[in-house]
Amino acid sequence: LRAGDRGLGDVAGLLAAGGGGAELGDGAVVLKIGLLGVLRISGATQILIMFFCYCAIEQTAMLWASSYMVGMDGMAEDVAATFTSIFLIGITVGRFANGFLTMRFSDPAMIRIGTMTIGLGALLLLVPVHNPALSAVAFILVGLGCAPVYPCIIHSTPTYFGADKSQAIVGVQMAFAYVGTMLMPPLFGVIAQATTIAVLPWCLLVFVAFMAAMHE
């Protein structure tokens, strides 16, 4: 909830911001752009939707992985909770590796690699073999795929939109991230309760598809 308050505060601050600009120490000017101004920037809406989808994937997978393994693989609850840490290990290892990979690959390339890896992990969950080891590998892949997306989106924002607009755009990106983080895990819970936990990989694939489409 505190994270959500910060996200709403970002949006409120952007809505209140007027025109003009502030000069940085190196002489560069940072434009003060309101929320509507950010949304009018070409490509900004797509990158915001992409950020929302990424955070929806990360948080939904992290919070529902154990329930999925209990419901689909028959895993004991305490073991499933332990296995959920594998997803976070995937993100951690991926972020460490990204520090080296970004020296060779561009931000767009890293985002594409991450998106494809998430998709591969979600597809593995659809294999009609209820095997805890297979699910563990699938969630590791989802975690590895998540690793480069968030930092590479942030890092590429000045390149895509210019340093003068990047501060405002990153603020709105954070707000969309908080909304995706808060909204989608409980919403998936409602969906799973009305249907079955087996829809988790399908939900992940839908968000991956949106994320890929918005990036391209």
Short names for language-model regions:
Residues 1-2, 187-208:
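A membrane-interface helix-boundary motif in multi-pass transporters
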Residues 2-25, 214-215:
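C-terminal membrane-cytosol helix-exit motif in multi-pass small-molecule transporters
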Residues 42-85:
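Extracytoplasmic gate region of multi-pass secondary transporters
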Residues 94-107, 192:
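Helix-to-loop junctions at the C-terminal end of transmembrane segments
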Residues 109-124:
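Structural signature of the two symmetry-related core transmembrane helices
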Residues 160-197:
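A late C-terminal transmembrane helix in Major Facilitator Superfamily
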